[in-house]
Amino acid sequence: MFSGRLPHLPELVVMIDAELLREPPPSPFLGHDEFDPEGLLSGLLLHKFVRLYRYADNGPPPSVRPEPPPEERPVHTGWVVLDPPNPNHPGRRVVFFREAPTSYTTSAVIGNAADVAAADTTTDAYRALEAVGASERRRADGLAEQVAEQGVHADVYVTRREYLAKATRRMNRETTVCTPEEALTLVSLYLRQQGEFIAAKPDRGSEFVMNRGLFYWVAARELLPEAWRWFAACAQHSAKVADDRMTYLGQSLLQRVARALEARDAVHVSSNQPQDNDLKDEALANTDEVLVLLMGAVDVTARVAHKAAGLPDDDVRHAGWQKQQWLRELGGQAPRVAELFVPESQLSDVITVLRLLRNSVHGVALQGLSLMEDNRPMRNLVGLPQDDEAKLLEAIARLGGCKRWSVVTHPRPLGSIFEPATLVDILFEHVIKLLNAVMSRTPVEDLEGVHLAAEHLGPPSARGPNSTWDPFEEWTRLSIRWQLGF
């Protein structure tokens, strides 16, 4: 009764500038040197849940043969074509055709967005061209965006057009305009929400698929390369002393990071929809989950460091990178790891941001608010905890500044607010660096029974004589990293 019924989301409509699409997509085996984010995206766009259209300013190239005309005109499979201007009509006709050879769809683009783009000299787009040429390029870019939004009603328009990347205000509100790398994260997120976890898709009929748990587990292992040595030492120590607790402790870090990646996905899903109060609550709940899981992962590294440094087992509950007395004790035995957290160091600031945001689960919850500015769509934002606002702002200022973290400070009662998806992403990047730095300096070799060799320092080679694919192969790990936007 409650089992999933897929697809549960509408078909994803994507328009892409034709020169960005690899046809056929590169195989990770046959075209390894060409397997990159752009090539991976080209494969995912062939998925049955995606409706894909190619676009070019001058229409399809001569090599693309039209289908026999169902009525008065030829049509091109998988292309959207903009007809020439008609002096008898105010707009431009758009024709697009998917697969069925007996019909095509027409729509129109109307309005002066292309003229506005042509006259817009507020950016440095196409400054290398003379004025007339630059204006025509901006016009073509603005027209392409109109075709994506008004003509095809695309959810995503994939492009590297210079003007669209630099223009700060555009007419389009319905279509997300993005680069291939950005589109890869969006398309992959959409497919993951449909239960599709794909490492590569070389053509329409084949794909390398994973289950959800394996996808996020491989992601955690890829993002934490220092964990291969660190976790191997935990497991060897457990085997030597016949006590599984260190193995479970090390495994808990990887499990929490994998689950935090899932919760991060949920934050992005909540943020990439027309906003309402329900989505605000979802974003808050999933942000809390990310904070709790990441803090739990960080706490694990402190406990392993406590054990590796030979500190008393009875005092392990005091282990924590924010605890100065414990850091002094650790510094006497493992100074290289303790020195990472001197006051106002980068990692100390990361702990401050993570800890103070996580601590909201013990008191006043993070508060969401809905904001509308300049007739723009509503945005759901989150306020920094008022009691810790000053400390958080100081740490964030040293970690790249408020703008990078999406934090904007207003007079009370609004206070300092942030976009949850942006803050979660930036914090995740910092915590991943922290975990790797700590694990690399933790003297796990000093644990009883640990004898590390070269095979313990990286991913295993698990492919057997009859297998064709190892989920820990480099191309698979890179694919998942790219799809998650790291």
Q: Could you say what each language-model-derived stretch is?
A:
Residues 2-11, 18-36, 46, 61-119, ...:
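Acidic, Ser/Thr/Gly/Pro-rich intrinsically disordered interaction regions
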Residues 256, 263-313:
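Amphipathic alpha-helical interface elements
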Residues 245-248, 252-265:
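Mature extracytoplasmic or otherwise solvent-exposed domains
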Residues 40-64, 297:
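Short internal beta-strands
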